[in-house]
């Protein structure tokens, strides 16, 4: 009888071991996976939270050295936390990476992590990344720092410093072996720059300077990068080696004013910018009638473009409404109230909502209520809220869909300890 009991135990153990082995074997069949993450910086604290955008779970909290503005790379593989008060730019690996294979893209999903590489200097300011090259500006330095995203991910501090004549509040745009840099005001470098020039990576000027009085604001869309001036936009393209700059003057039909904040369209080539406190301007650099003004119901707080639904952009206004902009029609297509009013009176850097778009959702931070409002991008209706400790302020989204080939998918990158799917 004891022999029969032992046989049953051995049989049971063997079956359990077999099932366990099957459960941990990698799935070698291709799998379509979608992953989106939100990176949120607190307004007052040196903290960056990472949240799974699809279910609201917190994935990580990173302690940095000061309150941060957040910028992401084009690839989404890296996030840059620019801490002006601390004189440092921290680098974060988003944990989501894509590999282009022509007819499809593979996706790798890992845990987000704070990288060891930091960029340091006096008063870090504007961040620009294009085609895998990063240019970080420092208002208190006479050089901009340029490096590759791949070096950041490897922890390699392979930085090229490009001279910008004098410390000033400007910008650098990286172009392979060149950069476009702002020109400081020769009479008073504390005032806005007066133009832009092309330099090689040794700081030597290439070609003629481009006048751009009151330069402030920059963005890329398609193959064109734009800089805002009091007189119009500087449009930068690169056809062969060195980039070329041309000036697009404001239309004479526009009222007096200029844009000082620009965002570039995704999927369509256009730019959207501020034009006074309660108007925005749409710029199509390919059309003869390049500029269209849109009147807002109240003063603008923040605006973004929709990278998924290319014809839309979103503007949050101080009355607590999110306004959907139809870029093709040049008008507000619909509006929805999402928060209490956030007046633009007071300090320019008071805690006010910021917007990000991830997949089919729109996310609006509500810093005074310690939460993020989630809206469905199709119905344009509020669907849920995500609680975030402190004052969630600056926000960027990273993610997308791709194929996973079995063992390359890190299922441990997102823990669900308190619930099951």
From Swiss-Prot:
Zn(2+) 2 binds at residues 101, 104, 106, 405. Residues 404-421 have a biased composition (Basic and acidic residues). One of its GO terms (molecular function) is metal ion binding. Residues 1-29 form the signal peptide. Zn(2+) 1 binds at residues 126, 169, 216. Residues 399-421 are annotated as: Disordered. Keywords: Chaperone, Disulfide bond, Metal-binding, Periplasm, Signal, Transport, Zinc. GO terms for cellular component: periplasmic space. Its main location: periplasm. It is found in: Periplasm. It comes from the Bacteria. A motif (N-terminal Zn(2+)-binding motif) lies at residues 408-419. Disulfide bonds join 212-229. Acts as a zinc chaperone in the AztABCD zinc transport system. Directly transfers one zinc cation to the solute binding protein AztC; the transfer occurs without the formation of a stable interaction. Binds 3 Zn(2+), two with high affinity and one with low affinity, and transfers only Zn(2+) bound to site 2 to AztC. Monomer. This is Zinc chaperone AztD. It comes from Citrobacter koseri (strain ATCC BAA-895 / CDC 4225-83 / SGSC4696). The gene is aztD.
